[in-house]
Design a protein with these regions (language model features):
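Contiguous transmembrane helix-bundle modules in multi-pass membrane proteins
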Residues: 1-29, 38-140, 149, 153-288
C-alpha cells in the first residue's frame, strides 16, 4: 500500500514539474536571444529562493502537525470495508504517518510554486529604499506602502494558509484516531492531547487574523474609495476604528483559545469565534 502512495505522489510531482520545465527552457532560449541571460538568471534565482524556503518551512510545519496528530492512532484505520471477493483495506499507524507526510509534501509544493511567482515582491522588499516622504495620516514613509506592505501581506497569507491546512489536517487525523468525535448529547468530545494541539493552532490563527487587521489599517491608503484613491471620510471615521477593534478581538480570541487548550471547557473558544464574527459582520454592515 505505501508503494502505491509513493508512486502517486511521484506522478503528481512530475505532472506539475514537467510543464514548468518546458516553460523554463523556452524562456531561457528567449532571454538568450535578446542578450538578457543575467536578468533571467537573477529572476530564476529569486524564484528558487522564495519557492524553496516556503516549501521547506511549510513542509516542516505541516508534517510535524500531521504526524503529531496521527501519533494518537492506536488501531488500524479501515479505509475501505471491502465486500464480496474484495478484501478490506486498512492502514496502520506507520502507513498513516507516511500518508500524512506525503500530503504535507504535496501541499508544501503547491505553496512553494505559488510563492515563487511572488519573486518580485521579495526582491522589492529585500532592496527597499525610503522615498523621504511620509503619508499625512500615519506618518509612514511612502516606501513602506510600495515595498514593505505587499511583502508583509504575502507572508501573512502564506502563514495563514499553512495554519489553516494544519488545522484541517490535524482535525481529520484526530477524527481518524477517535480522539475527536461529536456526541449528540454532549457535543464535541475532545481528548486532552487533541485539545492542546488544536487549541494552540487556533491561537496562532487568531494571531494571524490580528496581524491582518493591523496591516489592513495602512492598506486603506492604497485602496480606491469611490472616485478617489486612498482613505475616505468613512475609512477614517469608521473602518479604521473597526479594524483596530478587530485587532483587539483577535488578540483576545488567541488568549481564549489558549485557555481552551489548557482547560476541559469549550466555551472560551466559542466566545472567541462569536466575538470575532460579531465585530466583523458589524463592521461590514456599518461601512455600507
Amino acid at each position: 500500500m505505501p508503494a502505491r502512495f509513493v508512486f502517486l505522489l511521484v506522478f503528481l510531482i512530475l505532472f506539475m514539474v514537467v510543464p514548468s520545465a518546458v516553460d523554463l527552457l523556452t524562456e531561457w532560449f528567449w532571454f538568450g536571444e535578446v542578450a538578457y541571460t543575467d536578468i533571467f538568471i537573477r529572476t530564476l534565482t529569486a524564484k528558487a529562493t522564495v519557492g524553496g524556503l516556503v516549501f521547506l518551512v511549510a513542509f516542516g510545519v505541516l508534517a510535524a502537525n500531521f504526524r503529531l496528530a496521527l501519533g494518537r492512532v492506536t488501531k488500524p484505520y479501515l479505509l475501505f470495508p471491502g465486500g464480496g471477493d474484495i478484501q478490506p483495506i486498512t492502514l496502520e499507524r506507520t502507513q498513516l504517518k507516511m500518508l500524512g507526510t506525503g500530503v504535507a509534501a504535496l501541499a508544501a509544493l503547491f505553496l512553494g510554486l505559488f510563492a515563487s511567482n511572488e519573486w518580485l515582491t521579495w526582491l522589492q522588499f529585500q532592496h527597499a529604499t525610503p522615498f523621504g516622504q511620509t503619508d499625512p495620516l500615519f506618518g509612514r514613509d511612502v516606501g513602506f506602502y510600495v515595498f514593505t506592505l505587499p511583502f508583509l501581506d504575502f507572508a501573512r497569507y502564506l502563514m495563514l494558509a499553512v495554519a489553516v491546512l494544519s488545522l484541517i489536517g490535524s482535525t481529520a487525523a484526530y477524527v481518524i484516531s477517535g480522539t475527536l468525535a461529536l456526541d449528540p448529547a454532549r457535543g464535541p468530545v475532545v481528548g486532552d492531547g487533541a485539545r492542546r494541539h488544536l487549541g494552540l493552532v487556533i491561537a496562532v490563527l487568531f494571531l494571524l487574523l490580528a496581524w491582518g487587521a493591523y496591516l489592513d489599517v495602512p492598506r486603506i491608503l492604497t485602496t480606491p474609495a469611490g472616485i478617489i484613491h486612498g482613505a475616505s471620510y468613512v475609512d477614517i471615521a469608521l473602518r479604521i476604528p473597526v479594524l483596530r477593534g478587530l485587532l483587539f478581538v483577535a488578540l483576545v480570541g488567541s488568549v481564549l483559545s489558549l485557555v481552551t487548550a489548557m482547560t476541559p471547557r469549550n466555551t472560551p473558544l466559542f466566545v472567541a469565534v462569536g466575538l470575532y464574527v460579531l465585530v466583523t459582520v458589524g463592521g461590514n454592515l456599518g461601512s455600507v
